[in-house]
């Protein structure tokens, strides 16, 4: 019997690959956004409990939240969570600039996101061993971390020790037992619980040619050959003709603002 996978490469999921690149490219802006949330949002006395991010319990919990940090479920008050996206819905709580940042980066992939938020851990804090029984591959969900700041936090996933560093991403099955031991710095990361199948329902690649009304891209992923109905969050709907790694795009509305060598993310609507 093949052992179940614990750690995944971001390149296995086009939407997550895009997100990592977008967060890295806009790192300075994300850093400022995070600092603004830390400095200007109050801490609620609400403390969530394990497993509270799924089902009706989650709906009720989120509906009762204000625009505040909440305590994580640890015994010590050293772990804080701030909700950004819930069930594909972006929660615009910050100022207009903050909202624009989040919208620009996350709108293209919001359909894959079950939960997204900031996770702030105090220096020397720990998160005890636990499992997230719903965020596991058997339920079509995995966990994604993007470390914004903090150098020295160690996550232990089923005996695999990984150091979390700024600008680094991690995808893992949190149905395995895992824990965190922080170093002597504050650690802040973006946490996402995402839909695995939907995250693969994208074409992500580099534009190699612009000819007439067609856009040719070299996909970072091999797709099944065929013709697909597609949608781009900004450019609208169109068709994609796929031949393994080569994809020819045609949008219903002609585009003049697309540049060669740019990366582009396209959602597959149907085949």
Swiss-Prot record:
This is Uncharacterized protein L888. It comes from the Viruses. It comes from Acanthamoeba polyphaga mimivirus. It holds the Pfam family Asp_Arg_Hydrox.
């Amino acid at each position: 019997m093949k052992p179940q996978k614990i750690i995944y490469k971001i390149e296995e999921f086009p939407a997550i690959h895009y997100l990592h690149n977008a967060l890295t490219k806009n790192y300075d802006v994300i850093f400022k956004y995070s600092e603004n949330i830390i400095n200007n949002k109050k801490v609620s006395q609400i403390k969530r409990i394990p497993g509270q991010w799924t089902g009706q319990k989650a709906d009720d919990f989120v509906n009762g939240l204000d625009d505040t940090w909440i305590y994580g479920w640890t015994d010590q008050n050293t772990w804080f969570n701030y909700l950004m996206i819930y069930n594909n819905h972006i929660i615009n709580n910050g100022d207009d600039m903050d909202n624009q940042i989040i919208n620009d980066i996350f709108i293209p992939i919001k359909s894959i996101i079950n939960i997204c938020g900031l996770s702030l851990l105090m220096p020397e804090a720990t998160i005890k061993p636990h499992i997230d029984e719903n965020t596991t591959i058997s339920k079509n969900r995995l966990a994604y971390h993007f470390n914004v700041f903090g150098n020295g936090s160690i996550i232990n996933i089923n005996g695999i020790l990984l150091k979390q560093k700024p600008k680094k991403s991690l995808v893992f099955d949190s149905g395995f037992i895992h824990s965190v031991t922080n170093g002597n710095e504050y650690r802040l990361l973006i946490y996402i619980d995402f839909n695995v199948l939907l995250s693969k329902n994208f074409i992500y690649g580099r534009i190699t040619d612009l000819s007439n009304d067609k856009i040719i891209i070299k996909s970072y992923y091999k797709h099944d050959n065929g013709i697909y109905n597609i949608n781009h969050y900004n450019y609208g709907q169109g068709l994609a003709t796929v031949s393994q790694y080569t994809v020819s795009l045609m949008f219903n509305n002609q585009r003049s603002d697309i540049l060669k060598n740019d990366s582009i993310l396209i959602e597959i609507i149907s085949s």
